[in-house]
Structures are given as structure tokens and as C-alpha cells.
Amino acid sequence: MSNTHITDWSSKDGEFRRQVSSFRERISPEHKYFQPEKDRYHLYVSYACPWAHRTLIVRKLKGLENVIPVHVVGWLMGPNGWNFDKENDSTGDPLYNSPYLRNLYFRADPNYNMRFTVPVLWDSKYNTIVNNESAEIIRMFNDAFNEVIEDEEKRVVDLYPSSLRTKIDELNDYFYDTVNNGVYKTGFATTAEAYEKNVRVVFQGLDRLEQVLKESKGPFLLGDHLTETDVRLYTTIVRFDPVYVQHFKCNIGTIRHNYPHINQWLKRLYWKHPAFHETTDFKHIKCHYTQSHTQINPLGITPLGPIPNVEYF
């Protein structure tokens, strides 16, 4: 998002409508310009953002930490959007010393006039954005860099196996609209009608997720195989009780009290899998939402709870 005015993100009917990502190139060995190379591509993220969080998890699952450097924006978003203010725990922008993420967008396209979103997959060879759509970036991380991944065990990790693709695509489509984006449509609604409609959809989505996990033959959504669907849902669910319940008014229920199978799945991923635990920063998450969205929380007070953020496994 590029500013703090929530009403600017909603339509006149009070509904929040997510912007379509505009940079959609794909890295591949066969691409004319964007081939996989070590240290060429840089990932710009926010630890607060669930969409960017997906890319951090897959980067770690695939052993790309020494292939694709990461740069983190600060947790506080002001009128100029995401920034590289180190007082807000940013790493800074070592490539260009940019003050704001928007500077990268204008470097890639001087006429860019949309929101300045994360994640951003940046090409330091051509000084441009390759892709800013998280769903496509995690697919690239899953298979496009295999030839430069040194760890054999991580190289063979496949989060989008051919045998499960139909089911993965089906679940992704359903849960994107109801849960992943549903919490935003609820929280950024500017009319009671829009809020009430969307919050019900969120909990319908959670009900289905609970059932999918109840029927699963293994620890993950699709049995014994960790897939991108687990990753995509984790980044929303891990934020649900700490932020979305109170900040986005998704308070018909909580994960820990009303969804035992989701809660068990969440605890297992968070406490047993370093790629999930080590990329989850609750300071960034809580402070960003509660102190950046001033029209939702004008006093900028960040709640202490829940304690713990994720129940112990």
C-alpha cells in the first residue's frame, strides 16, 4: 500500500478492491533476459506484509538465502508508503540508498502511477522490477533457481508437485478470496454493510479450512506433502489472532479457541519448521498494522496480546 488513507483503498460502496500487480516477468533458464543467477536478483519485503512473507518462507525452504539477498522496509508506513527508515527496523536499501520503496518503482518505470507494494523481485543487472506478484514469485523460487541451489536436500523441495496441482490451484483460488484477501476486505471496509458481508465470508473460509485439515491424512493441508497452499495460508493465519481479530474486526471467533485443527497446524508450522518461525516477526506485524492504519486505530496503541502470539506446540 502506498499511503495511510484507508478510504483511498476502498470504492464508493465501501468495498476494498486489491490492485492487480503490474510487473509480471518470470525468471527461467530459457528467458531472453531474466535467467537465474546468484546475487543478481534482490528481494524487497516487509516482515509485516503477509504477501511478502510468503516469499521469505519459500526462499528459506528452497535454500536461496545465499542466492537472493533480502532487503527489509521499516514497519511504519507513512504518507509516502514503505520506507527504508532504520529507526523502524529497516535494513536500508544497499543497492541505491533509496529513502522509499517508491523510488525503486520509479527507477523501473518513471511513469508508474499505482500503489507501491511488496514484495518486489528486483534485477540488479537491468535495474528493473522483474515481478511484484507474490504468487508468481514463490513459483519462481520453487523451480527457477534449482541449478544454482547448493543444498541438494532443499533443491529437490517441490511445493507445487504435478500430482497435486489441480487441488492446490482449487484451494488457492478459494482461500485467496475468502481468507487471504477476505481479512483485508473486512478490515478496510468503510461501511457496515461491506464489513458485515465480508467478515461472514472470512469465517466461512475458516470453517472450510478447518474441515480440510480435519480430513487431511497428514500434518499439512494435502497430507504428508508441504505445498505452497500451506505457505499461502500460514501467513494469514499466523496474523489472525494477534492482529486481524482486533484490528480488522474479524472477531466472530479466534483460531486458538474456535478452530482446533487450524490451530494445531499453525503451531506445528511455527514451532517445528524454521522457515516459518524464523521469518515471522511479530514486532513488525503488530506495530505496522496498529500504527500505520491511522484511520482504523487513530491513537496508534498496539495491543500486548494475545500471549503467546502462537500457542506452544
Swiss-Prot record:
Q: What GO MF annotations does this protein's record show?
A: glutathione dehydrogenase (ascorbate) activity; glutathione transferase activity
Recorded E.C. number(s)? 2.5.1.18, 1.8.5.1
Instruction: Write the record's keywords in alphabetical order, separated by commas.
Output: Cell wall biogenesis/degradation, Cytoplasm, Golgi apparatus, Nucleus, Oxidoreductase, Transferase
- Cite the GST C-terminal domain residue spans from the record: 161-289
Query: What Gene Ontology cellular component terms go with this record?
Result: cytoplasm; cytosol; Golgi apparatus; nucleus
The record's listing under InterPro entries reads: Glutathione-S-Trfase_C-like, Glutathione-S-Trfase_C_sf, Glutathione_S-Trfase, Glutathione_S-Trfase_N, GST_Omega-like_C, GST_Omega/GSH, Thioredoxin-like_sf
Just give the chief location class: cytoplasm
Which superkingdom?
Eukaryota
Reported function: Active as '1-Cys' thiol transferase against beta-hydroxyethyl disulfide (HED), as dehydroascorbate reductase and as dimethylarsinic acid reductase, while not active against the standard GST substrate 1-chloro-2,4-dinitrobenzene (CDNB). May be involved in cell wall organization and biogenesis.
Q: Which family does it belong to?
A: Belongs to the GST superfamily. Omega family.
Q: What is this protein called?
A: Glutathione S-transferase omega-like 2
The record's gene field reads: gto2
